[in-house]
Regions:
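Helix-terminus loop motifs that line ligand-binding clefts
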Residues: 136, 150-189, 322-330
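C-terminal beta-rich recognition modules with glycine/proline-rich loops and embedded aromatic residues
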Residues: 34-59, 311, 373-381, 386-492, ...
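N-terminal secretory signal peptides and thylakoid transit peptides that target proteins
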Residues: 1-16
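Aromatic (Trp/Tyr) and acidic
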Residues: 39-150, 183-206, 242-259, 263, ...
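Hydrophobic, small-residue-rich alpha-helical packing segments that form membrane-like cores
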Residues: 220-223, 227, 234-277, 281-288
Length: 709
């Protein structure tokens, strides 16, 4: 039976994942009643609190560009870049990126060289020029705008000015790349311009530079003239035409030009078909994470529920076949392959970034908080582990179960042939550049505007947001929290005058007993998991909202992956703590075959690292069958002095468990941890106390465990 996803059913893909106790716990009773009256300064006449699935779309936001008719109204509206300023550990990730590989990639990557670069040439000619520059710039520039870093902003503007100045008379711009050599008529490759359009949109949000709109208008007018048989025909552009579609709608919402909707239909018609029931046009991990949203994007124009359903079906299909693992992603290293669905199968760093990007867009389009839940899962449990703690090196592939990170060729255990598990700043060409956008896109979409001129807190972290609400008043909301390493979020309102607007607070699906206080007064409301608390009132400066999100231990069983289990505490999933031995290697001698660097790049300043296990990793967990959660103890530790809880060994939350070694579970002939043994498994080894740490802080990890019989 096919579910109409407009009802946004909350079922997890497939019955293969069984919650023993935890994230998928029973929902609270349904109610739409306003909250009970609160005493003191929270007056009943001034307060309406209720749990809602999503904001209504009976009106459209008055203050920010949003979907124009005939596009369906968005449930959430993106705020301009730099509206959200992170603090605490979240800001620390951006600072580490700025001071690490992201901020210095211009000194290393040949594709960011200013010599013979096609992005700097009016005719689009040059030795260097494809996806790498915009991949990097869309993250680098947004980090600069958000941190208000003058050097990063200046460097970003150098490239943006070149793009604006070098648009050709035809309206086309960027590297003049043609694909289909040997064909009678090779086609102009449009893929590389798609991420650059995202860079231009961020720059326009930051600067309001009208030249961006003019460039895009001329470029899309040129796209309309490209013959259909030459339009979006190469593999990458054909798979990822949905990115082009997003940019067309972005411009339409600012100009109202109806010809853009004609172009949107042309793009949809010529993009790979992501609406095929039970299969995908290809199984490349980044294409999937980036392109599965294309049907739901076009649904905004088509109003055809089959388009929306197709996106949900694609997401569910991939998780059903290859995503029966913790961390929110799926195994596809580079492509997903039948028979390779064990948690040792990896995902590209690019794939994580594109999943976070897709989730943010789908959250706006559908109002369905499951997309925010998945962003949390990916960002907190997978993404940080793709880097060394200082963000000066990264690896192409990261897996939920990964006990070695080195320069060996692990093919065919993984699909890629080469040193794809090595932490190397000179390697991983696409991920080396695209990684920059991961955390900053998470930050930018942590707060959103709503159609009823309010604000929504989507992804909790220490931050502040400046936005226009209600009658047009500019307010500042400050969130004070160490979430996900604590259970409470404290929000303070600053406003020049009293202003009425709704504030939406997302209740994560794992949280079964959220509680709300306003100005110290408890508000009686059923906060349903997966919904939003909508707080409508007349807000005054220094009003204070406290949201408690009590975290519980949870154990998930992956029936399709040998009955293995994963252990959660709130939004965090935990890995065995494996001692990590770092071995420094030459960055230039351990690269993938397509790596290129500038002649003056100093490899001695940017070493590569192998990470080898310095302790046993092959354990089975002992579980209390009647109460699995009782098998674990939560241990709180001090906050790290450098403010980075994802650095190796610094997480302020750990778990304790018991287990036994499984001697037969070893490194296999491909140099990977062998596939999981079927649980329950027997072992005569002594019982040991095991230390578990958040998997996002574990570069070597076992996050899907066998269980003992």
């Amino acid at each position: 039976m096919t579910l109409d996803r407009r009802q946004f059913m909350e079922a997890v893909a497939g019955a293969a994942l069984t919650p023993l106790l935890g994230r998928a716990g029973s929902a609270m009773p349904s109610t739409d009643r306003p909250g009970a009256p609160a005493p003191s300064d929270v007056a009943a006449a001034d307060l309406d609190v209720r749990s809602v699935r999503r904001p209504p779309t009976t009106r459209r936001n008055s203050h920010y560009p949003t979907n124009r008719a005939p596009l369906l109204a968005e449930h959430f509206v993106k705020l301009p870049v730099a509206s959200v300023r992170p603090h605490g550990w979240l800001r620390r990730q951006l600072e580490l990126q700025r001071d690490g590989l992201t901020g210095h990639l211009g000194e290393i990557s040949i594709w960011l060289s200013k010599q013979d670069n096609a992005w700097l040439n009016k005719e689009g000619k040059g030795k260097h020029g494809w996806e790498e520059l915009p991949y990097w710039l869309k993250g680098y520039g947004d980090i600069g705008y958000t941190l208000d870093d003058a050097g990063m902003i200046r460097e970003s503007k150098f490239w943006i000015e070149a793009v604006l100045a070098n648009q050709r008379d035809s309206g086309d711009f960027g590297p003049d790349v043609f694909k289909g050599a040997g064909k009678r008529t090779p086609s102009r490759d449009l893929w590389t311009n798609m991420p650059m359009l995202f860079c231009l949109q961020s720059y326009h949000e930051y600067s309001q530079d009208a030249r961006v709109l003019r460039l895009m208008q001329r470029y899309f007018a040129w796209q309309r003239t490209v013959p259909e048989d030459l339009f979006l025909k190469d593999y990458w552009e054909n798979s990822r035409g949905g990115d082009n579609l997003v940019s067309v709608y972005w411009l339409y919402n600012r100009t109202g030009d109806p010809s853009l909707l004609e172009l949107a239909t042309k793009i949809h018609r010529n993009t790979a078909d992501w609406r095929q029931k039970g299969k995908l046009p290809n199984w490349h991990n980044v294409n999937i994470a980036q392109s599965f949203r294309e049907p739901a994007t076009y649904w905004l124009q088509s109003h055809d529920s089959r388009d929306l359903n197709a996106t949900y079906d694609d997401f569910d299909l991939v998780r059903e076949l290859y995503g029966q693992v913790p961390g929110g992603m799926f195994g596809a290293d580079e492509d997903a392959r039948p028979g390779y669905d064990d948690p040792r199968q990896a995902i590209e760093t690019c794939g994580m970034v594109e999943q976070i990007t897709s989730n943010a867009l789908l959250l706006r389009f559908t109002g369905d908080s499951r997309w925010a839940d998945n962003s949390e899962d990916v960002a907190l449990n997978m993404f940080p582990a793709a880097f060394t703690s200082d963000y000066r090196a990264l690896r192409y592939l990261t897996a939920p179960n990964m006990v070695v990170s080195d320069s060996r060729n692990h093919h065919p255990g993984i699909a890629n042939d080469g040193p794809f598990l090595m932490m190397n700043p000179f390697s991983s060409r696409c991920c080396q550049h695209n990684h920059a956008a991961g955390w900053i896109y998470y930050v930018e979409n942590s707060w959103m505007a709503t159609p009823d001129d309010g604000l929504a807190a989507q992804l909790y972290g220490e931050s502040e947001v400046r936005a226009r609400v209600g009658d047009g008043t500019d307010v500042r909301l400050v969130a004070d929290t160490r979430y996900p390493f604590e259970e409470q979020v404290r929000i303070t309102v600053e406003s020049p005058r009293p202003v009425a607007f709704p504030l939406y607070l997302r209740i994560p699906r794992w949280c079964r007993s959220a509680a709300l206080r306003i100005n110290g007064q408890h508000i009686a409301v059923a906060a349903r998991p997966g919904e939003y608390l909508r707080i409508a009132r007349r807000w005054r400066s220094n009003d204070r909202v406290v949201l408690d999100l009590p975290m519980e231990l949870g154990v998930r069983e992956w029936r399709k992956n040998k009955n293995s289990v994963s252990v959660d505490y709130g939004p965090l999933t935990f890995s065995l703590a494996i001692a990590e031995r770092y071995v420094q290697r030459s960055s230039t001698e351990t690269v993938q075959r397509d790596a290129r660097w500038q002649e003056g790049a100093d490899a001695s300043r940017w070493p590569a690292f192998e990470i080898q296990p310095a302790s046993a990793w092959n354990y089975g967990l002992r579980l209390n069958e009647s109460d699995p959660r009782s098998s674990f103890t939560v241990v709180r530790k001090s906050w790290p002095a450098d403010g980075n809880p994802f650095a190796t060994g610094q997480a302020p939350i750990e778990l304790r468990a018991t287990g036994r070694k499984l001697p037969s579970w070893e490194i296999d002939e491909h140099g990977l941890c062998a596939v999981l043994p079927q649980s329950p498994v027997a072992s005569d080894e002594p019982v040991e106390t095991l230390r578990l740490i958040p998997m996002g802080a574990a570069r070597l990890r076992i996050a899907a465990f066998p269980t003992l019989g």
